[in-house]
Amino acid sequence: MTGLLRNPVKNYDWGSHTAIATLTGRPSPAERPEAEMWFGTHPSGSSSVLRDGTWRSLADTVAADPVGELGAETVERFGSRLPYLLKLIAVDLPLSLQVHPSREQAEEGFARGTYVDPFPKPELICALTPFTALAGFRPAGEAAELIGGLGLPALEPFVAPLAAGDVSAALRALVQWPKEGRAELLDAIARAAAADGGPDHELVVRLAGIHPEDPACLAPLFLRRHDLRPGEAIFLGAGVLHCYLSGFGVEIMGGSDNVLRAGLTGKPMDVEELLRVTDPSVPPLRIEPEGGLYRTPAPEFRLGTAVPGAGLTLRGGVPRILLCTAGEVEGGGHALRPGESAFVPASYGPVELRGSGTLFWAEPGTD
């Protein structure tokens, strides 16, 4: 049986007072910043599903009948857990600079107590509004030229390894930068970047205003910038250093909390594990939808989107979350309006969609 969902909102400081509230038809601006709305079974915030007039945790519902809710194939591949987490994400302030481990790294790290779970955390972000992110390294020589162009000899411990093509050594120098003199250095970086005036340098100035003692504010000069238009998406696999800067979008990821931070945060950093996991050679991937599906290398998830019109049929046999972001869409026995969602269990069979609105759906990927 399908069921409407009620979903938790996460009030992180970097979130928006308006984006999620407006989409879901609640009073806007919200009193507190709303960063994310979660759709799924995550232990830190499971959705609730309406069945037979009663709201029940979706996580408990899945645990009570894994094969019926997830399907035998999904259980065989991922165990008795929904392998993905779907989100609305609203970014008003930059997130931390971060990276996630591969499946093998997560399993090994969990066994030795480094990670909180044994799962990878690949991510796909699809823009609903213009969305800006930093992801993947620029060529080392290009980064050395940009940062060296600031004309600050104090940055030589970072610039020199970049110029030599040793990105890992440069990253180590950055995250282990001496505490003494950081405020003065960041002030000099901000002034030099402001004098240049280019868009990436303007981002450096913005980050330095938020994190006035963090040399990771140089990230716009050593990472690639991605400006996504609505409907455009980027996939971030294991080892890809990244940071969301601004915008509103639909995000889907592997169900994991494994995060390694490299800066732009006051949270602790595991430097050695960060350097072991970060892979400068792995680029982010721009993903174009094929037949409405954003196909990625991640087996945990696949994101779909469509304006169904007179009719669209999705195959059955997989656990699927439906999310309307505009207009009205009928699917799984429900008429969904913006911000409304439903869970369709694997046992339901094919899902008939119709309507002039915009629908996103989440389902497991393929191996």
Annotated model-derived regions:
Residues 1-196, 266-284, 303:
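Transition-metal
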Residues 38, 98, 125, 227, ...:
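Structured core elements
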Residues 67-73, 213-229, 315, 321-338:
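A short beta-strand-loop-beta hairpin characteristic of the jelly-roll/cupin
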Residues 88-94, 101-104, 117-123, 127-133, ...:
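Ligand-binding loop in jelly-roll beta-barrel domains
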Residues 197-255:
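Acidic, glycine-rich loop-and-beta core segments that form the ion-binding/anion-interacting portion
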Residues 223-236, 240-243, 306, 331-350:
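Short acidic-glycine-tyrosine-enriched beta hairpin
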Residues 248-293:
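C-terminal, non-catalytic macromolecule-binding modules
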Residues 299-317, 335-338:
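Conserved short histidine dyad/triad with adjacent acidic residue
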